[in-house]
Amino acid sequence: MHISEINIYPIKSLKGISVESAVVEKRGLEFDRRWMLTDRGGMFFTQREFPRMALVSVWIEEGGIGAAADGFGEAFIPRLPEIRNRQPVTVWASNVEAEVHSPVLNEWFSDVLGTDCQLVYMPDDARRSVNARFDRGNEIVSFADGYPLMALSEASLADLNSRLDESLPMNRFRPNLVISGAEAFAEDDWKTVEIGGARFRSTKPCERCVITTIDQSAGEFDGKEPLRTLAQYRMAKDVMPDRLERLGVGENAVLFGQNLIAESVGATISVGDSVNAIEVYETNFVPVSSS
């Protein structure tokens, strides 16, 4: 197995960036989801409510990042705001302190989304813990939904696409790491995995939501797939019934991909790096064959 693609998403729920290598930090890959759009009260925005967020491009520049949207031009976003304005923000059930960016940037993003919003940045001293079930005392995460990284294999997507009338691209699932050379759903059973010179441990498989039904190139919802098909063979009660209580996964959760926590902070991983499963769960699950 090896890494075939590395993706980072500097601003939560905006378009991702494919990179050749990335530095592994405690809270995830460098730059990944360190910025986020919220309402003025600090509640997070995602494509679930604003699917057109998928159309905003982001890139890395010296001293910060850039963003662009058709019809709205470009914006430069410094890593830290020039005027410091710290505010608590909310991602699901967790709260964390963040720096609010300038009124000019907030107005630009408000125009792009067609709703009042603000851009915030997670500073280095902010601490947002992962789910307590998987926290060994010092595990933190960026503005990602719950865990520092998510990996998905090409074979798992190929298996799904074999069941769909129209194949879907990998960007529907927004993984950080795409794995080539694995069997379909091999990532389900990872406990510990080594990538290049870095080691990661799994938390629980990724529970999929309606964002997977958004056409990332159009910024629009596109029917009920792939959730409808995934629900036929990837519900937790069917995939790993013996692990539900331990992992804290609901029996009807739709699973696709694996969440990871880094144990090798400071390492650099690159496209082409080998991927070795050091420790795996024993499983009796056999993927449902395509009809």
List the predicted regions and their residue ranges.
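Metal-cofactor-dependent catalytic cores
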Residues: M1-S291
